[in-house]
Amino acid sequence: MSKSEQLFEKAQKVIPGGVNSPVRAFKGVGGTPVFIQKAEGAYITDSDGKKYIDYVGSWGPMVLGHNHPAIIDAVLKAVPNGLSFGAPTESEITLAELVTKLVPSIELVRMVSSGTEATMSAIRLARGYTGRDKIIKFEGCYHGHSDSLLVKAGSGALTLGQPSGPGVPADFAKHTLTCTYNDLDSVKTAFEQYPNEIACLIVEPVAGNMNCIPPKNDFLKGLRALCDQYGAVFIIDEVMTGFRVALGGAQAYYDVKPDLTTLGKIIGGGMPVGAFGGKKEIMEYIAPTGPVYQAGTLSGNPIAMAAGLACLTELSKAGNEEKLAAQTKTLAEGFKALADKHNVPFTAQYVGGMFGLFFTEQAEITNFQEVMKCDAAKFNRFFHLMLEQGVYLAPSAFEAGFMSLAHSDEDIQATLAAADKAFAQL
């Protein structure tokens, strides 16, 4: 029995399902989850000492690679001053200034401790600001596990085969309208049906929780126009895409300006940080300047602020954005070429530093229903064939993969060499 198997058996006695987030349990791909002991650069090492080239990157935050010296140094310098104060610090101002510089649509920003907290707070703010209750989200998109948003959600909910599940009151769900991603007509219909009741529309600009699905050319700008027409707050959820699709986020990449933006993952550099921000007139509607309440004991935590500031400062250096995108392109197109070589129905999609692998005859995947028609069983087999060769992909056919600046050309070629063997066995 491997050390990971021993640890998983032990974990299940004290932790529900043996994990602290469902996708980690490998329910989507089968087998025993890999327990990680340490990580460095593009590599993770499991409890048995086996190394893997990592394309999960803690589900996105590790854009510089694991254990980056700039982040570690910043954290070690901050720790001796105290771990948490529950009071304002200069570091939270500095990080906020950098965020507003990198993402111009954000005029004011509030720090929180997770992406879920960011989206939950943004939804509450939009409802308070507009005086309306209903929200629009998209089938297959995931915005965290708050009640209002766990309605036909993607991510772990899909991995478990529960697009919506128990524990979410019907009274919450009735206010959430679910439209089809990349289909403006479905959004128009929702607005026409409830023209004066919709507080906001929230969207993943690149849907990364039903794998990796970019928006069609007119989709995001069409959403912006509909929100303007009906007086709804337009929220772009950049928890995953922020600073990864482009330094200014997917909104910069696709040239669209939201009213509110939610952030997470990269903004913390590996520490638990989320944020939401946007137009001053909306953000000032939140406490203490406005009536909408939001608070957090660990919001703006000084250690997390130090890590986030170091991460964004390093990522902002010239050439990094382009390098990340180029490496991702090489990997994704390499996967596709190898699948074609072995006559495996397959397509790869990518934007900036994120990518998706689909086992399908379709040349392009554009929405949730098309994702559900892909061959998840074949992905599961591919996942394990890659894992055996020391390549760690997302353990779910519904999750995007992530490139980091630590991945070298040699790492990518080693990954593709492993993929060549894996595709040959499918």
Curated annotation (Swiss-Prot):
Q: Which UniProt keywords apply?
A: Cytoplasm, Isomerase, Porphyrin biosynthesis, Pyridoxal phosphate
Q: In which pathway does it act?
A: Porphyrin-containing compound metabolism; protoporphyrin-IX biosynthesis; 5-aminolevulinate from L-glutamyl-tRNA(Glu): step 2/2
Q: Name one GO molecular function term.
A: glutamate-1-semialdehyde 2,1-aminomutase activity
Q: Supply the EC number(s).
A: 5.4.3.8
Q: PROSITE patterns under this entry?
A: AA_TRANSFER_CLASS_3
Catalytic activity from the UniProt record: (S)-4-amino-5-oxopentanoate = 5-aminolevulinate
InterPro entries assigned:
4pyrrol_synth_GluAld_NH2Trfase, Aminotrans_3, Aminotrans_3_PPA_site, PyrdxlP-dep_Trfase, PyrdxlP-dep_Trfase_major, PyrdxlP-dep_Trfase_small
* Location in the cell: Cytoplasm
Looking up CDD domains in the UniProt record yields: OAT_like
Residues annotated with N6-(pyridoxal phosphate)lysine modification: 265
Gene3D superfamilies, A to Z: Aspartate Aminotransferase, domain 1, Type I PLP-dependent aspartate aminotransferase-like (Major domain)
Q: Which cofactor(s) are needed, names only?
A: pyridoxal 5'-phosphate
Assembly and interaction partners: Homodimer.
HAMAP family xref list: HemL_aminotrans_3
This chain's protein is named Glutamate-1-semialdehyde 2,1-aminomutase
